[in-house]
Amino acid sequence: MKILTAQQIRECDQYTIKNSSVSSISLMERAAEACTEWIIKNIYHINKINIFCGNGNNAGDGFAIARMLKSKGFYVKVFTNMSANFSTEAAKNLKRLREKGDIEILDYEKAFDAKFEENTCIIDALFGTGL
C-alpha cells in the first residue's frame, strides 16, 4: 500500500478533476459511496452512526455518507458547527442532507450532552488534507 502525503492527495484530486471531466462534488460522491459500501460490508451489525463534520470538503464527504447510510436503513446523527462557513461542496451536501429531512443534524454543543449508545459507529469527517 502506498501512503500519500496531504499535498499528494490534493494533487491527485486536482488531477482527477482536471483530466477526467469529473467535478469536485462528483468526486466527493464517489468517495462517499465507497465509504458507505465499506461500512455496509464491514460493520453491518451496527445500525447507529454518528458523524462529526467540520466545515471543509471532508465535512462534505461526511454529509454525503450520512445521506447514503440513511437511505440504506441506518440510524444516522450528524454533529457539525451550524454557524460555520462551509466549503462550496460541503454546503451543497449539507443542503442535500437537509432536503432528505429525516436525519438529525445537531450542533457540536449537543455532543456534550448526547448519550452515545453502545454499538454506535462514530465517523470523523472533521479534518481532511487541509489540517
Which residues make up each language-model segment?
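Positively charged, low-complexity intrinsically disordered leader regions
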Residues: M1-I46
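Glycine-rich phosphate/dinucleotide-binding loop and adjoining beta-alpha-beta core of small-molecule
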Residues: K2-L4, Y44-L131
